[in-house]
Amino acid sequence: MMNSKLFTSASIGPLTLRNRTIRSAAFESMCPGNAPSRQLKDYHCSVAAGGVGMTTIAYAAVTQSGLSFDRQLWMRPEIIPGLREITDAVHKEGAAVSIQLG
């Protein structure tokens, strides 16, 4: 199975993934105050350490009125440092990270 094309690197535009496995978005409910948390960071680092090529942070609202659930991520300038922390930590594990906007 390890000889499968699934485990070979792949490029998406300028991004090269270490393999073709991608953790799809599934609502984590790990964003108290609608901001990234240590729990969210640890979760995605664990997924990355497990070997996926890319993990996806789920269901981020782009406006406050777009929030559907408690503990849902809300995209705004003040959360950028927290997202940067997650991104850096996931990259350190060798994976890429994406985000689902909704």
Where would I find each of the regions flagged by the language model?
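Flavin-dependent oxidoreductase catalytic cores
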Residues: 1-102
